[in-house]
Amino acid sequence: LIVIFYSYIEKLFTPIQNLAEQFNVLQSALAAGERIYDVLNIKSELEDAEDAIEIDHLDGEIEFKNVWFAYVGEDWILKDVSFKVKAKENVAFVGATGSGKTTILSLIVRNYDIQKGQIFIDGLDIKKYQIASLRKHIGQMLQDVFLFSGTVESNITLRSEEITSDIVKEACRFVNADKVIDKLPNKYNEIVRERGKNFSSGERQLISFARVVSHKPNIMILDEATSNIDTETEALIQDSLKKMMNIGTMLIVAHRLSTIQHCDKIIVLKKGKIIESGTHLELLDKRGHYYL
């Protein structure tokens, strides 16, 4: 009887103990949820002007005019930067870490507002465009590709109803992503694990290229997107980049010579200032900072 009694006592307390443990997990989840909502409810410092216009189409001409920018106070990251990018031109920005390359790209999508100067897209100050509308026409390809849990196709469409399966497949063929996807057991319905853990860095980058092309942006931004690619997909990525350079304005930050040498213009930055610009061959002939 004593053995049976202790056996029943154990069966009684085990569910209670499990419930107590789950309660701790629930409390942690509620606390995490509150922090997430706090972040989501942060109001953006950037707001549309009352007369901001919605964009139907961009040609892709970009101009920086005497731009000064600092993240904090007057610790200037960009100092009196001026340059012009023609529509459908391919321009690369090179320079040491901290020279302002990525900052320039962030300002074009208006992640921040500048302190001095002006930034124009298609001849109009970017502050006169609706922020969401502007970003809709700019495709970004970054070093760290974020893939969501879901199918390959949903990661390319980003749940947009305007992008059909045919558009997805066409975009994948264009950027050579189909050569990777067609080898998958379920092809476009293959499940992507969290953050794309079941794909190599190069494969994730090809999927991000297809994502951008399928949304048909007028301006494309490539920020160190070729820095961590694997050797197996490097040739596919370089070939897809050459194709993408012909469909819109492209701005590139990269350290790989193979990525930037075919650009129409290369802008060299040093400590927030433009020190020289030209084509790859022109800059080599100058034997300046780019040559070194």
Task: Enumerate the language-model features and the residues they cover.
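Membrane-water interface of transmembrane alpha-helices in multipass transporters/channels
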Residues: 1-7
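Generic alpha-helical structural context detector
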Residues: 4, 21, 34-38, 169-173, ...
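Conserved catalytic core of two-component sensor histidine kinases
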Residues: 6, 13, 135
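Cytosolic ends of transmembrane helices, especially the final helix of ABC transmembrane type-1 domains
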Residues: 11-39
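Short, conserved catalytic or interaction motifs in soluble domains
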Residues: 14, 28-31, 41, 131, ...
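Signal-transduction coiled-coil helices of two-component systems
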Residues: 26, 43-46
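Conserved E/DxxT/N motif and adjacent residues on the DHp alpha2 helix
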Residues: 38, 45, 157
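ABC-type nucleotide-binding domain
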Residues: 48, 55-292
